[in-house]
């Protein structure tokens, strides 16, 4: 659901189409507004994005691009055509007062919604696309914990400092709920789906003990979903979650997620037919094509078989 600038250019050149009106970046991982490509390919979904704040507006990617710090305190460095997030600005976290002293972003800055309602109304009234509210930040509370604290510290805190980690998770969730609130104020009547994002798995299984998800993370996901549903009852909740996450799926359903994206079909427990058989009555699976082998190395017949 997002393309880096370099990949976008390769696809545009390959298909040979020209753009007439394009915003360079949407402020998320330095990605382009690629609706012209979606139009060309005839896809049936369009994503709506919160706007970047002034300090997070960037120009075309090029040799002169320098690392920068975003409003979360995260450092963006250009690596092989995309910006890698680093810096771990809360790696020093030791006590609850550190959480409160941190300069958290203000979700309600006016520039985040400039022209957003008008764009949503235009797509809703004059197209037949399914409209999706793109995740308003890089990810939800677990994803952002890993960015702000660092992977190692995050995982250690779930075991050794559960009380402090839960205080951090609560604060993180509250800030993110503000982003969803301001987003839905503008696009809620027009979208059919809104996205959340948490990578809970590795290629081999869960990233952490699934019991921790149920004991701590579940209720925060549930709380966010309840707030979204209260403001926009018709909206379906899509979770972007990479990895071999089958063991999480019953709890994800219980938390209120309606759609899971992607399905990494080559990983343990992620066979699309088995997932549909076991969970299909409660969950929609989106994106089940093997992009690692079939799309890169398969022939046309392989791809057709995979899609079916």
PLM regions with names:
Residues 1-2, 43-53, 71, 134:
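Acidic/polar N-terminal loop/beta-strand segments that form early-domain functional surfaces
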Residues 1-20, 69, 78, 96-308:
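Active-site loop segments of alpha/beta catalytic cores
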Residues 10-55:
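Segments that shape or occlude catalytic/ligand-binding pockets
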Residues 25, 82, 296-297:
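N-terminal low-complexity, intrinsically disordered patches enriched in charged
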Residues 42, 62, 126-127:
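Short, well-ordered loop/turn elements at secondary-structure boundaries
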Residues 48-62, 108, 135-139:
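Short, glycine/charge-rich beta-strand/loop segments that flank catalytic centers
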Residues 53-105:
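A contiguous, low-structure linker/loop signature
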